């Protein structure tokens, strides 16, 4: 029986499921899954608020798991699927871990370090280059984030309204 090769879309849907776990924990809904030889070796979702850890981004969580599974910090030939373009911190971790590719959904104009704001992954001064595939399920990934922030703004507005009515 031959091994099934899963598509970028398949793995991005898995990352979106993880992003929804972040939403359920009231974290910014970003999910990441790390794949090596068609097998999940790490996964994560944003958890900086709950963990009181500014580095607990989805990508970092997945890379940490991958290192433990592979018993090596070098994750050569691994592919990281993430619902949002990585930030500078996460892009740096990808370079240090030596992953081969990052596949992301939505671009991040404010903090994206894989081409939107800057391109850390292809910077000529870096000792490793990470291939980039972007736009996989981009609209769905962006909609999840937009819906989350819309909900948060509505909650804040309702809290302010409730507070002003008690004053």
Swiss-Prot record:
* Cofactor-binding details, from the entry: Binds 1 zinc ion per subunit.
Return the InterPro entries for the record.
Answer: APOBEC/CMP_deaminase_Zn-bd (IPR016192), CMP_dCMP_dom (IPR002125), Cytidine_deaminase-like (IPR016193), tRNA_aden_deaminase (IPR028883)
UniProt keyword Cell inner membrane present: no
Which PROSITE patterns would you find in this protein's record? CYT_DCMP_DEAMINASES_1 (PS00903), CYT_DCMP_DEAMINASES_2 (PS51747)
Which cofactors are reported in the record for this sequence? Answer: Zn(2+)
> What reaction(s) does this enzyme catalyze?
adenosine(34) in tRNA + H2O + H(+) = inosine(34) in tRNA + NH4(+)
Functional note: Catalyzes the deamination of adenosine to inosine at the wobble position 34 of tRNA(Arg2).
**Which protein are we looking at?**
tRNA-specific adenosine deaminase
Q: What gene is this protein translated from?
A: tadA
């Amino acid at each position: 029986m031959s091994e099934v090769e899963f598509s970028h879309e398949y793995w991005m849907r898995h990352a979106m499921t993880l992003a929804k776990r972040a939403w359920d924990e009231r974290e910014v809904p970003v999910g990441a899954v790390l794949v090596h030889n068609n097998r999940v070796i790490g996964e994560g979702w944003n958890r900086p608020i709950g963990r009181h850890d500014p580095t607990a981004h989805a990508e970092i969580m997945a890379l940490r798991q991958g290192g433990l599974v592979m018993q090596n910090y070098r994750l050569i030939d691994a592919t990281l699927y993430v619902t949002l373009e990585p930030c500078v911190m996460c892009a740096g971790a990808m370079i240090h871990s030596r992953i081969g590719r990052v596949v992301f959904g939505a671009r991040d104009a404010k903090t994206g370090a894989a081409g939107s704001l800057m391109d850390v992954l292809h910077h000529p001064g870096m000792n490793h280059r990470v291939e980039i595939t972007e736009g996989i399920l981009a609209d769905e990934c962006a909609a999840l984030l937009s819906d989350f922030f819309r909900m948060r703004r509505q909650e804040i507005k309702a809290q302010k309204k409730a507070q002003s009515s008690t004053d």
